[in-house]
Amino acid sequence: MRILSKRQVTELVLYSPQHIARLEKAGLFPKRVPLGPNRVGWLEIEILEWIEERLRRRDEP
């Protein structure tokens, strides 16, 4: 299991940190994992599944 940093997630999904926060608040993005008082991360598998879901939607008729 791998945890991605905010920078890694923004590079992977090509969204700004602010947009990711809005999606999280709306329940449309994987939840962050608190790592410390000022540090968060995301499970890589959840981010990859989120991307795959978008790809499946793209391919739907």
Predicted regions and their residues:
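Polyanion-binding surface elements
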Residues: 1-23, 52-53
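A short, Lys/Arg-enriched interface patch at domain edges and termini
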Residues: 46-61
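Residues that recognize and position ribonucleotide moieties
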Residues: 2, 40-41
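Short Lys/Arg-enriched helix C-cap and helix-to-coil transition segments
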Residues: 33-39
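Short, solvent-exposed alpha-helical "recognition" segments
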Residues: 26-33
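Catalytic phosphate/metal-binding cores of nucleic-acid and nucleotide-processing enzymes, i.e., regions
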Residues: 14, 35, 44, 48
